[in-house]
Amino acid sequence: SEMCIRDRLLMAGMFVIATSLWYAVDYVYAVVVNQQKSLGFDWEHVYYVQAAVLPNESVECDTASRSDDEVTAEYLEFYNRLQHHPAVESACYTLMHFHYIWKNGSGTMSYDTLKTSAMYREVTPSYFTVFRVRGADECSPEELSRRASHTNDFVVTENTACRLLNPDINNMTVKGVELAGRFIHSGVSMRKDEPDSVRVAAVCENQKYNEYSNWSKAVYRIVQLGQGDFKISYGSIPYHDIFIRVKADADRPGFVESFRKEMKKQLRVGNLYLADMRPMSYYRNEHLADYRSDLYTYLAIAGFFLANAFLAILGTFWFRTQQRREELAVRLVAGATPHNLQTLLMGEGFLLITIAYIPALVVAYNLGISDLVETWPVEWSFTRFLIGGLVTFLLLWAIAAISIWFPARQAMSIQPAEALHGE
């Protein structure tokens, strides 16, 4: 019959709409889930301090040759003067590690027969207090810094530790903190005094590279400035970074200008000087600009899908209900109540959407297992599929209910004589 043909066309349209809407909902779900994951560090009140070497053309430059030991001594003096400023809460040194800047080493870590790749970074113990990094067992940054106080010790992120303890990433019974105190093979040797087998002093919380990325696997090699094989030359200065955490009550507008003015002479050590100083918020905003642009674009596309789904379903069910005005009025004349008719129409709509949604779910699941959906930073899982499917179905049903309720309510007001005339 004509009604059957219309219903089949309606279900075909619902299938296309449901699949497209699920894809949009799945992306939004992944974004929301990732935003719930902790960043793993605190960038507020943290500043990057850039030490640089006076150019040879400068009248203040001492052109006498310097050994690496002498340059290292200058660098240590620069660092010590910096951290003793009254406004500085703590300072740290890093090599191959700069939050929001793609500056990393990498290596393969192994424990027994298990291996995993991870970002390799070198930091002083105070790094964990400057960036407020907590332990995987939720210990304070100060306690984590105390545990990681020996040169060549390693601190690994929890996800790295879990990979080294168990190859099954879905096994939640294995805790990363169990790796603390054990020895692993780092696979990376940046300094002469670094042994191949290193002790894991502590396990820290998982860390993201930025707010829009997934947790990264990373290992931190502990260095103590001035100890062991730690050496710096003028040529290597750009690769070494210093960060300070400023006391909250001192971190006010104009702080950088006043700090640089006050410390200009104090931080002139040998041929080293304070070249630049910027808050981490500067690097964060610069780094996240492209991510935000992409996110807003994808969210706009998702919103476009949702708006189109709403209009398509609204128009379809509205037209379908309007086409049955006479039938509904006749049912009223025959003794049906408005509530009965509302229930009938809602039931029909629910059934049509459900029948159309089943094949749409099959297609959606196959899109997921075929990696045709975004799997970074949130991995594909059956739970993700179920939640996305449920949210999509509820959206479809809510839109359909609105689309049915308004025209059905109008149809209830038709006069019996008009209904019988139309019949």
Task: Give the positions of each predicted feature.
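Short juxtamembrane loops and helix-capping segments at transmembrane helix boundaries
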Residues: 34-41, 362-390, 414
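Transmembrane alpha-helical interface segments in multi-pass membrane proteins
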Residues: 305, 326-372, 387-391, 395, ...
